[in-house]
């Protein structure tokens, strides 16, 4: 993280759902898995103090949420919903602080970009519990009231974009998956343009893609034959990389999956809802 920060911009963090209060926290030595003490919210703030918290414009007293003023005219609002293990919920006491920060930014004539780990919008029709912030409706009302145009999230490990009215949410793909993407966000006074691109060499990208497809193929073989598993692997690769414009609907293989495994075909159909879409690019207006 310090090396990344040395490239010329700040590195800013927010806890994810695996970072705090974990009963299964462990370290690894060779093949051994050794239980260790988990990280608390206070530990997280101390460990990552140089990565946002030390220079926070404002910090919430009830969570690890904070505001970072990136430059004149732009603030980044980090909303924490993981201070309680597995909660996926913003503490109710945090909402007055969020509104006060949005009101202050509005009064100063400054734009706000929001960030969360779990998503504010539902990006897949099958997956809500554990993926979407449980009290997101209250947060969305504030974002609409104070004209927050975009939220950057993660958690799902897919590259995806969802828009509801004037609000856009970009789920940024995980570096550990498939194309190993990073997102580039270019801002103007009127809005922003987002592009996902691989952060690794073409050789490593090909290796990561092959590894991902092999795992997806193995999972598919648990319920189908090689042709069915290959189709599932292709769809998963397209979905996680955000390139559903490269996927296709195969009626014959869908029929075979429907006969073999109701859960898998339901999952496949949820992916195909985004058929034809390229989620590696997005734009929004302030």
Locations of the language-model features?
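His/acidic metal-ligating clusters that form di-metal
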Residues: 9-10, 69, 75-77, 85-168, ...
């Amino acid at each position: 993280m310090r090396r990344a920060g040395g490239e010329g911009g700040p590195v800013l963090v927010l806890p994810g759902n695996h970072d705090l209060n974990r009963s299964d926290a462990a370290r690894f030595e060779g093949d051994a898995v050794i239980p260790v003490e988990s990280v608390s919210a206070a530990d997280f703030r101390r460990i990552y103090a140089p990565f946002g918290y030390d220079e926070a414009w404002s910090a919430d007293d009830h969570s690890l949420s904070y505001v970072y003023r990136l430059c004149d005219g732009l603030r980044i609002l980090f909303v924490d919903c993981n201070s309680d293990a597995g909660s996926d919920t913003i503490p109710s006491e945090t909402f007055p602080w969020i509104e006060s920060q949005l009101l202050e930014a509005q009064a100063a004539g400054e734009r706000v970009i929001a960030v969360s780990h779990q998503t504010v919008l539902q990006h897949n029709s099958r997956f809500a519990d554990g993926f979407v912030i449980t009290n997101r409706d209250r947060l969305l009302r504030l974002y609409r009231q104070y004209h927050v145009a975009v939220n950057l999230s993660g958690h799902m490990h897919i590259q995806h974009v969802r828009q509801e009215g004037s609000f856009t949410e970009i789920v940024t793909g995980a570096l550990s998956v498939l194309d190993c993407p990073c997102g580039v966000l270019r801002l103007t006074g009127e809005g922003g343009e987002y592009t996902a691109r691989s952060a690794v060499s073409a050789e490593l990208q090909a290796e990561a893609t092959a590894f991902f497809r092999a795992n997806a193929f193995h999972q598919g073989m648990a319920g189908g034959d090689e042709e069915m598993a290959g189709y599932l692997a292709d769809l998963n690769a397209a979905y996680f990389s955000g390139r559903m414009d490269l996927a296709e609907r195969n009626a014959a293989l869908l029929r075979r999956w429907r006969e073999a495994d109701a859960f898998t075909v339901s999952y496949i159909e949820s992916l195909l809802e985004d058929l034809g879409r390229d989620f590696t690019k997005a734009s929004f207006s302030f």
